[in-house]
Amino acid sequence: MKGLLTLAWFLACSVPAVPGGLLELKSMIEKVTGKNAFKNYGFYGCYCGWGGRGTPKDGTDWCCQMHDRCYGQLEEKDCAIRTQSYDYRYTNGLVICEHDSFCPMRLCACDRKLVYCLRRNLWTYNPLYQYYPNFLC
């Protein structure tokens, strides 16, 4: 069910004007990890993609759980995590967030923390978890 909802949500947002930081996150994941964000991480394990529950399957999935928690903290501060966009640069392997206001800067920081974690955990990536059914979590 998680996979179908995520796919429906992604397709609905795939019109030319995709709101928020989703394009930034996709771009950041692909630049830092070299992997296709949607294909490789959109449905991975128990936490990558929208929502999450249970125990993370590996280091890669743990990164996504940490990212969910980071976003949860921003929601508690009334940041619009699904619609807020932000600017960043990727230079010499570093992600540099470029905002002065709280929500865009913190959203970018959550995403930066995720992509660095995913890069550190590339060795844990297991294709068996790429389209993992949520009911097994």
UniProtKB/Swiss-Prot annotation:
Induction: Up-regulated in white adipocytes upon high-fat diet.
Record's subcellular location: Secreted; Cell membrane; Cytoplasmic vesicle, Phagosome; Recycling endosome
Pathway(s) annotated for this protein in UniProt: Lipid metabolism; phospholipid metabolism; Lipid metabolism; leukotriene B4 biosynthesis; Lipid metabolism; leukotriene C4 biosynthesis
Active site: 67, 111
Tissue distribution: Expressed in peritoneal macrophages (at protein level). Expressed in heart, skeletal muscle and white adipose tissue.
Residues that coordinate or bind Ca(2+): 47, 49, 51, 68
Disulfide bonds: 46-137, 48-64, 63-117, 70-110, 79-103, 97-108
Post-translational modification: This enzyme lacks one of the seven disulfide bonds found in similar PA2 proteins.
Cofactor: Ca(2+)
BP terms from Gene Ontology: arachidonate secretion; fatty acid metabolic process; leukotriene biosynthetic process; low-density lipoprotein particle remodeling; negative regulation of inflammatory response; phagosome-lysosome fusion; phosphatidylcholine catabolic process; phospholipid metabolic process
E.C. designation(s): 3.1.1.4
Disruption phenotype: Mutant mice show increased high-fat diet induced obesity, increased visceral fat depositions and exacerbated INS resistance. In a model of systemic candidiasis, mutant mice are deficient in clearing C.albicans in kidney, liver and spleen, resulting in increased mortality. In K/BxN serum transfer arthritis model, a well-described mouse model of inflammatory arthritis, mutant mice develop severe autoantibody-driven arthritic response characterized by increased leukocytic tissue infiltration, pannus formation and bone and cartilage destruction.
GO MF annotations in UniProt: calcium ion binding; calcium-independent phospholipase A2 activity; phospholipase A2 activity; signaling receptor binding
UniProt KW keywords: Calcium, Cell membrane, Cytoplasmic vesicle, Disulfide bond, Endosome, Fatty acid metabolism, Golgi apparatus, Hydrolase, Lipid degradation, Lipid metabolism, Membrane, Metal-binding, Phagocytosis, Phospholipid degradation, Phospholipid metabolism, Secreted, Signal
Function: Secretory calcium-dependent phospholipase A2 that primarily targets extracellular phospholipids. Hydrolyzes the ester bond of the fatty acyl group attached at sn-2 position of phospholipids (phospholipase A2 activity), preferentially releasing fatty acyl groups with a low degree of unsaturation such as oleoyl (C18:1) and linoleoyl (C18:2) groups. Hydrolyzes low-density lipoprotein (LDL) phospholipids releasing unsaturated fatty acids that drive macrophage polarization toward an M2 phenotype. May act in an autocrine and paracrine manner.
Designated name of the protein: Phospholipase A2 group V
Source species: Mus musculus (Mouse)
Gene: Pla2g5
